[in-house]
Regions:
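A cross-domain feature marking catalytic cores of carbohydrate-active enzymes
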Residues: 3-6, 44-46
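Active-site acidic/histidine proton-transfer and metal-coordination neighborhood
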Residues: 11-168
Length: 168
């Protein structure tokens, strides 16, 4: 192996709450353990709640292969019609909301079910599945953070793990 991808960053680290310091130390140990096996590239992301967000887990390619797919309008649909979040106009333009509404009208029940599964169920190999109420509760933990706060928390995380990464 040359790369380890998607080592989860716990939400408490992203929020800098509760036991985040212990979790960062655990992450440092993970980095050191991976490096001890001559793997020097580790990929991760810092998204709230889920490790990856995709809106379709089985997008058919022209070659008949399957791929993961992300559709921004479907995320708006997910927030608007599945999570039933308020104040979407603070995150999305009127045009985006209107386009999402149009797309939603074209979706069948199975399309909505698959969208919900893709976003809340994670990748096919993932064992983590959330109910709508669990997902909303976890998302609510981020309600007081804006993009600047999240970026600052990411900077702090990187500042703490970089010495271990550079040493190994």
């Amino acid at each position: 192996w040359n790369v380890v991808e998607s080592i989860p960053v716990h939400n408490n680290i992203k929020l800098r709450t509760k036991n985040f310091k212990k979790l960062i130390n655990n992450y440092k140990d993970t980095i050191a353990n991976i490096a001890a096996n001559n793997i020097n590239t580790i990929c991760y992301n810092f998204m709230p709640i889920v490790d990856w967000t995709r809106t379709q887990l089985d997008f058919k390619l022209p070659t008949d292969g399957l791929a993961l797919k992300f559709n921004y309008l479907q995320i708006i649909i997910f927030e608007m019609y599945i999570l039933k979040l308020k104040n979407l106009e603070k995150r999305y333009s009127n045009k985006q909301i209107k386009n999402a509404e149009k797309l939603f009208k074209l979706m069948k029940t199975n399309d909505i079910k698959n969208l919900k599964l893709a976003v809340m169920g994670g990748l096919p190999a993932s064992e983590t599945k959330y109910s709508v109420s669990e997902f909303k509760e976890m998302l609510n933990a981020y309600k007081d953070l804006d993009n600047i706060d999240i970026k600052q928390n990411l900077r702090e995380f990187i500042k703490e793990i970089m010495p271990v990464a550079e040493e190994n």
